[in-house]
């Protein structure tokens, strides 16, 4: 079966975008760090030169401080350079993996099956990382050599920040907001505002009203024009720090806000890093199961309906397998306009040379494959045995099946 490589690229797009986004963010960190440190060092040197009356000890102390700062900058830059090298390596590996499709012309070829197996392992590892199974995902990546195709570090940091929010700690999420402030602002995100509001609310809960006022003056001025109603609602807590349930302010004081902050962080994290909100493994399973799902897959095995009896013999259908049958219950049925009738004995299509026949119990097989199977199993003359139930029926009781 021929295929077009570009049809497969859509599943690789999120990983490629994430690699480029990591490179962009890392470059911004390098640029911002260099600009800040250069400004500080130049300002210190200018001040040192202009202070002609300063003692030698004071000058030596400032020079030592500068040397220490330069050493710290060097270590920081080395760390950022190592991160950049890692992101470049990951990007190159993902592009090479995607480029392997160019030499494949058949979806049934061994090359495409090997490529698909690697992709499946990557999708499973991504799913496990997104759901907190970091240890299992790391082992899978190591065994399958997927370290450069799966963003283990990204998901680990996400889990760390998400868990810290649920533990009512805001330091990690504020640090993340600071690193990505530009893109959060571009996306009109309110994550940092909500995190700052939560810190303000916690100060009020602790009866630290003076500290809460100082905190509001220091951090809320930026959002005063954009979110005045939200800030006014929070400011009312200074005058009325306790409210009964059902009041307009009770939601601000509720512990449910921590769940809300964790959910808000998740949506912002996926938007910043171009991570699909629904795992690709979910999307692929849903599409595949829905394309194969028919009413026959969900007939009761104890039903006397002949279709229910026949459905138990279709072992090639993925939707009929116990592990996938439950997953497909909520999915729509396939919109099939042209059916292919398959022999349950051989898995091959039925045609005029191997026309379908039905036993009295309702089970249907191809006549030629049924005769061949019975000859191989020594059925007595004039009878045919049902391969599924093992019962024998006279040949004349078989009925020809017509598909309309």
From Swiss-Prot:
Zinc finger (RING-Gid-type): 317-389
Localization in the cell: Cytoplasm; Nucleus
Recorded family membership: Belongs to the FYV10 family.
GO cellular component: cytoplasm; cytosol; GID complex; nucleus
Catalytic activity: S-ubiquitinyl-[E2 ubiquitin-conjugating enzyme]-L-cysteine + [acceptor protein]-L-lysine = [E2 ubiquitin-conjugating enzyme]-L-cysteine + N(6)-ubiquitinyl-[acceptor protein]-L-lysine
Keywords from the named record: Cytoplasm, Metal-binding, Nucleus, Transferase, Ubl conjugation pathway, Zinc, Zinc-finger
Pathway: Protein modification; protein ubiquitination
Protein task: Component of the GID E3 ligase complex recruiting N termini and catalyzing ubiquitination of proteins targeted for degradation. GID E3 is regulated through assembly with interchangeable N-degron-binding substrate receptors induced by distinct environmental perturbations. Required for the adaptation to the presence of glucose in the growth medium; mediates in association with the substrate receptor VID24/GID4 the degradation of enzymes involved in gluconeogenesis when cells are shifted to glucose-containing medium.
Enzymatic class: transferase
PANTHER family: E3 UBIQUITIN-PROTEIN TRANSFERASE MAEA (PTHR12170:SF2), MACROPHAGE ERYTHROBLAST ATTACHER-RELATED (PTHR12170)
Protein name in the entry: GID complex subunit 9
GO MF entry, a single one: ubiquitin protein ligase activity
LisH domain boundaries: 116-148
UniProt key word Ion transport: no
EC numbers for this chain: 2.3.2.27
InterPro entries with a match to the protein in the record: CRA_dom, CTLH/CRA, CTLH_C, Fyv10_fam, LisH, ZF_RING_GID
Subunit: Identified in the GID/CTLH complex. In the absence of stress, the complex exists as an inactive anticipatory complex (GID(Ant)), composed of Gid1, the E3 ubiquitin-ligase Gid2, Gid5, Gid8, and the RING-like subunit Gid9, awaiting a substrate receptor to form the active E3 ligase complex. When cells are shifted to glucose-containing medium, the substrate receptor Gid4 is induced and becomes part of the complex, named GID(SR4). Additionally, Gid7 transforms the GID(SR4) E3 ligase core into a higher-order supramolecular assembly (Chelator-GID(SR4)).
Record gene name: gid9
Any GO BP: negative regulation of gluconeogenesis
């Amino acid at each position: 079966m021929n295929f077009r490589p570009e049809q497969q690229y859509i599943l690789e797009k999120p990983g490629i975008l994430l690699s480029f986004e990591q490179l962009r963010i890392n470059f911004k960190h390098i640029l911002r760090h260099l600009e800040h440190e250069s400004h500080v060092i130049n300002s210190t040197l200018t001040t040192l030169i202009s202070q002609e009356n300063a003692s030698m000890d004071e000058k030596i102390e400032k020079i030592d401080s500068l040397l220490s700062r330069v050493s710290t900058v060097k270590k920081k830059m080395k760390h950022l350079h190592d991160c950049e090298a890692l992101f470049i390596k990951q990007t190159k590996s993902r592009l090479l993996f995607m480029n392997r499709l160019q030499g494949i012309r058949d979806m049934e070829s061994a090359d495409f099956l090997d490529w698909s197996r690697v992709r499946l392992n990557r999708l499973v590892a991504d799913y496990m990382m997104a759901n907190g199974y970091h240890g299992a995902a790391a082992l899978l990546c190591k065994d399958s050599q997927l370290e450069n195709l799966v963003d283990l570090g990204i998901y680990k940091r996400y889990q760390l920040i998400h868990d810290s929010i649920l533990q009512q700690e805001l330091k990690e999420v504020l640090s993340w907001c600071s690193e990505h402030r530009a893109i959060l602002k571009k996306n009109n995100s309110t994550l940092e505002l909500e995190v700052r509001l939560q810190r303000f609310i916690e100060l009020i809960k602790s009866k630290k009203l003076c500290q809460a006022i100082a905190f509001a003056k220091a951090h809320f001025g930026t959002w005063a024009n954009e979110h005045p109603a939200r800030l006014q609602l929070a400011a009312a807590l200074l005058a009325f720090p306790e409210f009964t349930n059902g009041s307009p302010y009770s939601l601000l004081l509720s512990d449910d806000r921590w769940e809300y902050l964790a959910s808000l962080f998740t949506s912002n994290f996926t938007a910043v890093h171009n991570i699909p909100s629904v795992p690709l493994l979910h999307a692929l399973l849903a599409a595949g199961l829905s394309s194969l799902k028919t009413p026959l897959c969900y007939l009761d095995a104890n039903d006397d309906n002949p279709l229910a009896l026949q459905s138990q013999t279709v072992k090639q259908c993925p939707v009929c397998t116990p592990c996938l049958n439950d997953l497909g219950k909520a999915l729509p049925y396939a919109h099939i306009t042209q059916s292919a009738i398959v022999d349950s004995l051989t898995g091959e299509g039925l045609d005029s040379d191997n026309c379908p026949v039905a036993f009295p119990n309702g089970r249907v097989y191809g006549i030629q494959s049924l005769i061949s199977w019975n000859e191989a199993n020594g059925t007595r003359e004039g009878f045919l045995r049902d391969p599924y139930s093992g019962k024998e029926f006279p040949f004349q009781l078989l009925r020809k099946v017509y598909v309309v």
